[in-house]
């Protein structure tokens, strides 16, 4: 079951997000959804469907290895019924953030990313002129048994 996106704790989180421009939500994904995403990612990896990451939309998409060296797999909701519970939950998250912060968040896109040892993602601007619609980025770490000393955001 997805967390409730209402109440005092949610309101405090949205206040922090509005003030600091980021929010950390531990244990965000319900365990059953997390397991489904793990299984899906394992199949993507086993089938060698991860591609070198790039920045920019459509024809402007460019691989710049000095900015990021990870590998990604874009999620396409109509083609991935096994991830429907994930997408339904993210619909609820999008709606709750939009309502709390008075934003017009109409859509989203997701990808899975793998960072092999030594891989990186440097801060950059990739809000290209052809698309000026990004308002919020959501990063969900799927690392099992992750500890703060392992590093990362």
Describe each model-derived feature in a short phrase:
Residues 1-137, 141-153:
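Fe(II)/2-oxoglutarate oxygenase catalytic core
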């Amino acid at each position: 079951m997805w967390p409730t996106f209402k109440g005092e704790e949610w309101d405090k989180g949205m206040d922090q997000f509005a003030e600091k421009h980021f929010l950390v939500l531990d244990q965000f994904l319900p365990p059953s959804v997390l397991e489904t995403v793990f299984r899906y990612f394992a199949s993507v990896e086993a089938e060698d469907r991860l591609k070198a990451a790039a920045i920019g939309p459509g024809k402007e998409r460019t691989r710049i290895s000095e900015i990021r060296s990870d590998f990604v797999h874009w999620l396409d909701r109509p083609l991935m019924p096994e991830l429907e519970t994930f997408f339904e939950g993210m619909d609820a998250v999008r709606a709750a953030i939009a309502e709390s912060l008075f934003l017009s968040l109409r859509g989203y896109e997701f990808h899975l990313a793998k960072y092999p040892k030594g891989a990186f993602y440097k801060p950059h601007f990739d809000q290209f002129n052809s698309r000026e619609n990004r308002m919020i980025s959501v990063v969900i770490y799927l690392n099992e048994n992750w500890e703060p000393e392992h590093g990362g955001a």
